[in-house]
Amino acid sequence: MARKLISSGSKFEAEIGYSRAVVDGEWVFVSGTTGYNYATMTISDNIVEQTEQCLQNISAALKQANASMNDVVRVTYVLPNASEFELCFPVLKKYFGNVRPAVMMLAAGLADKAMKIEIQVTAKKQARPAGKKKPVAKKKAKVAALKKPAPSAVKKKVVKAPAKKKVAGKKKK
């Protein structure tokens, strides 16, 4: 399979000479991505909003690569102020809570003082049946459904559990 280059349209990609993402076989390498909204070339001054925008930008790049956030296997976070990382946890959990990729966080300066976080991901595309792509929400719902016991099994456990305890300890009168 040929290498595929993906662009977000960010002016930085052309100026510096890099791709938002590179697809090589089943692997997708997404460059360090900041919280810029590439349509407006604006950035929030709030780290939580920047984190959300970073992950939206990454999700869009993965989609162009025929991958999704569910395919992410490694994430690197870079923050100029490491003490702000905890503020990002709810947003990160929203995107990666079920995926649980390998992660590393670094404290380092970024290219612009307005940038409060930069996120880089590596994804490995999962095998999918030809012509069928499962939306993330449906896939998560299916996994959750598989983990839940059938209602009849729950009722049987509730009914049988006390009987087992009584049989082991005392006889019924």
Identify the meaning behind each predicted range.
Residues 1-56, 60-65, 70, 79-173:
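N-terminal presequence-like segments and the immediate start of the first folded domain
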